[in-house]
C-alpha cells in the first residue's frame, strides 16, 4: 500500500530550529547592549532639555504678562529658596509691588519641583538670598532697585561626575532685554555664567 502525499506539503515541519532561534536571540542581545548606553544618554538629555525649556517657558510667560498688563511680572522659586523645588510666575498687582507673591497678585503659572537628581545654580538676581526674576512693562529684566538684571541659571544632573557633568548641563541665560535662551556649556563658547547677551 502506498501513501500519497498531498500536493504542496513538505515532509519537514514549519518553524525555527533551536540553532536559528539561539542565533537570533544572540544577535538581538548584542544589539541591545550596544544601544542601551545611547538610550540612557538620550533619556538624560531629554529630561534636562525639558527642565530647561520649562524654565524658559515660565520666563517667557512672565515677560509676556508684564508687557500685556503694563505691570511687573516675577518668577520666584515656589519655596522662596531653591529653583529645583519649582517656581511660580505671577503679575505683581499688589499695593506694595515688591516682587514677592501676595494674596492680591495674579498667579500665571506654577512649575512643580524638578526631579531629585537635578541641581540648579544661579547668578544675578536669581542667586540672591530670596531669588527672583522680574520683568517690567517693556519686557526688560529688572532688579527690585530698578536697574537692569541679567541673570543665568544652570541646570545639571547631580548624580553624575567627571566629563559627563559638562555634557549634562544646560544654562538658561536671560539678557538685560529680557530675552531668554538655553545653551549647552560643553559645546557653546558663549554659554558662560556671566553671559549677558
Spans of features found by a protein language model:
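N-terminal helix-rich module
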Residues: 1-13, 22-25, 30-60, 64, ...
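Residues within the helices of the helix-turn-helix
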Residues: 19
Amino acid at each position: 500500500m502506498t501513501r500519497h502525499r498531498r500536493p504542496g506539503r513538505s515532509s519537514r515541519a514549519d518553524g525555527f530550529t533551536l540553532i536559528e532561534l539561539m542565533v537570533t536571540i544572540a544577535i538581538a542581545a548584542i544589539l541591545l547592549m550596544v544601544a542601551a548606553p545611547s538610550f540612557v544618554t538620550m533619556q538624560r538629555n531629554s529630561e534636562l532639555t525639558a527642565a530647561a525649556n520649562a524654565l524658559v517657558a515660565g520666563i517667557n510667560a512672565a515677560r509676556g504678562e508684564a508687557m500685556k498688563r503694563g505691570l511687573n511680572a516675577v518668577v520666584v522659586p515656589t519655596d522662596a529658596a531653591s529653583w529645583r523645588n519649582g517656581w511660580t510666575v505671577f503679575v505683581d498687582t499688589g499695593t506694595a509691588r515688591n516682587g514677592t507673591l501676595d494674596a492680591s497678585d495674579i498667579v500665571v503659572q506654577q512649575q512643580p519641583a524638578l526631579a531629585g537628581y537635578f541641581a540648579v545654580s544661579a547668578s544675578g538676581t536669581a542667586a540672591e538670598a530670596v531669588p527672583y526674576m522680574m520683568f517690567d512693562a517693556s519686557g526688560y529684566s529688572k532688579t527690585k532697585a530698578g536697574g537692569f538684571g541679567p541673570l543665568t541659571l544652570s541646570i545639571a544632573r547631580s548624580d553624575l561626575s567627571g566629563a559627563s557633568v559638562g555634557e549634562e548641563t544646560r544654562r538658561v541665560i536671560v539678557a538685560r532685554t529680557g530675552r531668554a535662551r538655553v545653551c549647552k556649556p560643553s559645546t557653546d563658547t558663549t554659554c558662560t555664567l556671566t553671559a549677558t547677551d
